[in-house]
């Protein structure tokens, strides 16, 4: 089993993890970082000028990196002995596993969060909603996950899921930052349908983060100020409940 992460734009400090001798650890980076622990540090062949896109691409398109069972973890969260033990069980049991979000939102609620925090300009989000509606995705299907950890094998279904997970970040060639919890749900619908992806409880402590940069250090934040109007229009496009 491989556990991998990406420390792009020196966004995180490496936490004090528990390391298992039977696990291979791989960290991708683009700028000089402190290298500690038994990681294999690999300088990323960056495909994009935006460091966030490089980090997202690494997380989403894991089938391009590994043939073995592999676990993504955001670089700011700490792995415990129990985390590694559970990870071995998850990859033994399922071809892909996701975590239930501890504070679930609807699809529209997730889009509104993205709007409210300014990660995506309003006009682009409207176009993204239209793309989702055109896919046939039903908002009632959406079961909110948190993707700071994902357990995967390199199978044909996982490859297809990865590609939808990545591609639904884009609309008309423009990237929609911080909407991956929605795009993973769309990917699940398009690939797995009624089969669903197995869910597990949260496996990391979100309150313990080694992140050293703010969103403003890496994202171009938009000033979205018409939330009531946006909610009404996006709801009609998606045919979604609040």
Predicted regions and their residues:
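Short, solvent-exposed loop/turn segments at secondary-structure junctions
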Residues: 8-11, 32-33, 47-49, 77-79, ...
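Catalytic core and acceptor-binding pocket of nucleotide-sugar-dependent glycosyltransferases
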Residues: 116-228
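Conserved donor-nucleotide/metal-binding helix-loop-beta segment in metal-dependent transferases, i.e.
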Residues: 79-112
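A short acidic, amphipathic alpha-helical/loop segment
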Residues: 14-17, 62, 82-87
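Residues that flank catalytic or metal-binding motifs in active/ligand-binding sites
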Residues: 21, 59, 73, 144-147, ...
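Short beta-strand-to-loop acidic/aromatic patch adjacent to the donor-nucleotide binding site
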Residues: 68-77
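Short acidic (Asp/Glu) patches
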Residues: 50-60, 85, 128-135
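N-terminal anchoring/stem segment of glycosyltransferases
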Residues: 1-55, 65, 69, 169-177, ...
């Amino acid at each position: 089993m491989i556990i991998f992460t990406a420390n792009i734009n020196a966004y995180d400090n490496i936490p004090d993890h528990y390391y298992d001798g039977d696990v291979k650890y791989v960290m991708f980076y683009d700028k000089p970082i402190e290298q500690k622990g038994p990681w294999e540090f690999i300088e990323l062949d960056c495909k994009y000028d935006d460091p966030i896109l490089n980090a997202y691409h690494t997380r989403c398109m894991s089938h391009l990196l590994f043939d073995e069972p592999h676990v993504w973890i955001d670089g700011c969260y700490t792995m415990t002995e129990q985390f590694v033990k559970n990870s071995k069980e998850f990859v033994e049991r399922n071809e892909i596993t996701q975590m239930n979000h501890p504070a679930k939102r609807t699809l529209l609620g997730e889009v509104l969060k993205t709007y409210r925090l300014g990660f995506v300009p309003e006009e682009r989000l409207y176009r993204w909603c239209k793309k989702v509606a055109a896919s046939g995705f039903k908002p009632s299907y959406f079961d909110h996950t948190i993707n700071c950890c994902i357990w995967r094998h390199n199978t044909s279904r996982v490859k297809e899921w990865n590609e939808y997970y990545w591609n639904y970040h884009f609309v008309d060639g423009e990237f929609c930052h911080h909407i991956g919890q929605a795009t993973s749900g769309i990917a699940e619908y398009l690939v797995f349908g009624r089969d669903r992806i197995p869910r597990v409880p949260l496996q990391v402590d979100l309150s313990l983060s080694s992140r050293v940069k703010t969103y403003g250090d890496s994202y171009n934040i938009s000033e979205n100020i018409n939330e009531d109007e946006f909610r009404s229009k996006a709801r009609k496009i998606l045919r979604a409940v609040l």
